[in-house]
């Protein structure tokens, strides 16, 4: 079955229009500044084996839906890490290490972020400690170990692994490189988001003769979605409709936008969309997403 025929079978379960929508480029670029976005692209585009990932056209689906064009950004070959996450964690490692070979990098992860941090640490010859919960598969742990990381499994869920990471990092003076923000910890998540914004720079180079009408973004804690919104503010001369998609069982962005404030939700059953099964929006992404998203949509696991 082709990708576009699979997509044509997707159905949404919830749809919400943001009543507080107010896309303001200046406000967005105060949170994730233009200079930070530009620097991320300049650094990452200089890495060995860098190339823009493909923007693929879903011709069958666009014909079926009577739309001009539908594109999807194919991140499956990004630095051979098979995820856009390669842009974020590894870039943050490079920025926070500042050429110091004696520091130890640490992070908590459900998979792809840790893989990026491990890879970024290996590139720079840094020690790396990665904390994972008991729910993370051994195959994912094995990949992170293949990049030289010391993988530490913690009983409980992701929050338990993050708490242990913070505890051990404070005790051992390790540098945490986390993609989730909390009070007094916002710089590194912003660096991670700046890395993700490279995708929007590439898209702006790949679509040069037409305007983008809609951008559909997946969301877990919101970092990638907010980074792409900032990229839109930086690189596009128009504002497309922005739609955030989440698992039905973990719609923390939708519920927060509906409430007008961050709402922590209880996840009764983990979604098969593992990296998106998140119960709370991260602080920095929320500052961007709360007014910049037009619509929120959820999708049930049975349609994935």
Locate predicted features:
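PLP-dependent amino-acid enzyme catalytic core
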Residues: 1-304
